[in-house]
Amino acid sequence: PIPDAATLQRFLGPPLAESFMRYCGMTEQEAARATDDYRERYNPVGWKENQVYPHIRALLAALKKRGAYLAVATGKPQQSAETILRYFGLTPYLDAVAGPREQDLHADKGALIRRVLPENARAVMIGDTPGDIQGAQDCGIDSVAALYGYGEKAELLAAGPTHAAEDTAALCALLCPDMEKQKGFFVTLEGVDGCGKST
């Protein structure tokens, strides 16, 4: 049976196979098969249905102009993440991208962050799932809970983020307070994980 909407919402963020096992009671083999079935549609066309939240492109540009090192640590397979970022024109802002290999069923967010985090860097992880916040904590860095993303607000706040942003305007104010406010800015694309985490 197809899970209800609340359960499907929980699929956003963690690796897909992990969600199939956790929320649908599948075995690892069944979850791998279900993930393959999902990718039959997602790989050719589904990924193009992403969107970048308002203000994210301007925020990336402003941070880059200030010399910030910008990276993505995502639960999406690395190749898919790179394709999405390139398609939506976000690659020029980024210094690094880390995601699990296509065949990996589990992704440790802390390990993914460490892959893109320069040694002794002062950094912040922006994420919309408790796993993102936990990954930041595992790496000893600050975090911003993107409350406008796909994660459950209560769960996200319970994870103990350093900061929280209700919307992308609040995220801009937090990360780049002197950034010019955007009026009538584009409404097109989405951050790779649904919340502009590409910052």
Question: How would you name each of these model-derived features?
Answer:
Residues T7-L8, A58, V97, I126:
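Structured catalytic core of nucleotide-sugar glycosyltransferases
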Residues S19, H55, S80-T83, G135, ...:
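Phosphate- and divalent-cation-binding pockets in alpha/beta enzyme and binding domains
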Residues P177-T199:
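Glycine-rich phosphate-binding loop of ATP-dependent small-molecule kinases
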Residues Q103-K109, A154-L156, L174-C176:
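Short, charged, surface-exposed secondary-structure boundary motifs
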Residues E18-E28, E49, R57, A61-A71, ...:
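Substrate-recognition/cap helix-loop segment adjacent to the acidic, metal-dependent catalytic center
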Residues V124-A165:
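Acidic, Mg2+-coordinating phosphoryl-transfer loop and its flanking beta/alpha structural elements
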Residues F88-A98, E155-L175:
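Structural recognition of alpha->loop->beta junctions
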Residues P1-R57, R66:
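N-terminal helical cap/lid subdomain that shapes the substrate entry/recognition surface
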